[in-house]
């Protein structure tokens, strides 16, 4: 009958007893494995082999990365077990499979920024100071790799000129990118630009855009604040090339469609608003759930107006960006 799903879930071994761990962080502090790229900060800083995945994680319980833990790999170390006063470390844990019956399933696979290897003209692979908007978000976050201080990844200096580039891979019918608008880029770029101007008034900010799309409630007013109150320079035009100079700066070569001319800007950082695409887990999950998808691998709702969060498959519900680009 509808809503009677038997689901098998693989629960990965944490190697830490959740009922005993207090989240004190002493094990992380003492762990000798220090040079593991931090996935949550997109590899811009490092974590330890035992760690709490991110700030404000729920539950606030440490986990051990089996691929990098010396004790789990070769039986040599055990520092975290020695310093844990709660006795929460358990190297004997194994992955377990849980089988339960559920009345409904919610697909919430989210999204990923598009890979930028096809867009070499923006210099992402050539310079550490060309970053994606998500990387820039982490750089400005208090829990990020620089504790919220905006610094250039290449040399740790403060950037005095930042160029934001819109629609990198969005609205692209060439086959390299995505044909659809990613919807959220115009607003988060305006937010980032205002954050920079508010915290660092000496920093010059430029935004290159095709169109500014701000259809939501108070969205256009938000964008106008960036221009009128914060002095963000919006330039309607396309960026043709970004390349590093010998002195460490970046040259942005672009067109200004309003002035009808080619321009060059010397920048300290370039931020790319990368297109949103479905998470790679979406298609395999849809196959398991027998749920329908569109040509872009987003889940399809039963009816856009009458049943906007239901899949055509009874008992399967859709949440967030699994249906398409969305803001919070």
Model-inferred region functions:
Residues 1-328:
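Residues forming the flavin
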